[in-house]
Amino acid sequence: MIKRNLLFVILASLSSLSLRAQTPTPADAMALEQQGSLAEAERTWRLITQNTPDDAAAFASLGLVLSKETKYEEAITAYKKALALNPKLPGIQLNWGIAEFKQGRFHEAITPLAGALAADPDSAQARTLLGLSCYGAKQFAEASKYLAVVVKTQPSNTELRKVLAQSCLLAKNYSCAESEFRQIVQQNPDSASAHVLMGEALDGMSRTPEAIVEFQAAAKVAPREPDVNFGLGYLQWKSHHYDDAKVSFQNELAIDPNHAQALAYLGDIAMKENNFGQALAYLEKAVQQRTDLRVAYLDLGVVLMEQKHYPEAMAALQTAIKLDPTRPDAHFRLGRLYQALGNAPEAEREFAKVRELHEKEDDVASKMGKPPE
């Protein structure tokens, strides 16, 4: 009997030792991470969280390993569990935000990154990622607010300054955009993109002559860069410098013979010069390349009407209206076409629409001109 009891004691002791040997510890998991055995480290952290389900740090560590394995969805679940257990655990919101950001989920990244920045206002990483997430989420005013602070501490970071400048431009904060683009041009005088962005900012401020100078500089630096010559031509067209614009558009076509916008605006210039045959050739080719160019369909309608191809003209004008029903010019042209066809009721309907749209434009303009109440 004594021997039997002794055997039971020894067996119980061995079982206890075996269980202790099989119970993983955080040190085991961290050692596996350092060895690069991420799959084993993940399994170990999962066992630890099962054994100690109230251990926030264990869930946080599991999230880090999962992120290293690019298992971002699972990592986010682990981070959220860690935060639920201990909302004050440092670094978790930042890691959660990074996992969202790396998936391109910019809207979802904003909340945890804002939390990370609130917890550590001196974190350049949290502020930078928050600014970039706002930019990715098209919250441009917010993006510029965060990125402006970061750029001040990293003045030589041209790529980050470009994002800041574009954020300012898209938020219609043109003075900020101009200031940042000037810095970029000074740092990179041979950068075509810097001159283009500066030109866009100046044009946004209705300083088109200065914008043209910037686009000319871009075209000089990179004469075969796609869209640079078109951008220059568009500004020249906008300024009614049609001869210069034609040269720029032709330069774009030398790079891309099917550049739909260059074709459309060359067609517009030919139409304005009453060269309807050439205009028709350009415009028809433009709409073959792209079906969303309102100016091409509007001009096609005008040219076809001049040539008395009324059914085709009507189809083109109706397409222009469908692309943007708020613009009065296509309605006016369609009204004139109905007049030519002797359809007075339809003509009057289109002219009424023209008056309505002009009244809306006048109303908006008058409201914009009023001082704030």
Regions found by a protein language model. Give the residues of each.
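Helix-start (N-cap) detector for alpha-helical repeat units in TPR-like alpha-solenoids
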Residues: 22, 56-57, 90-91, 124-125, ...
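Structural signature of tandem alpha-helical TPR/SEL1-like repeats
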Residues: 34-43, 47, 68-81, 102-115, ...
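Alpha-helical adaptor scaffolds
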Residues: 234, 261-264, 268-308
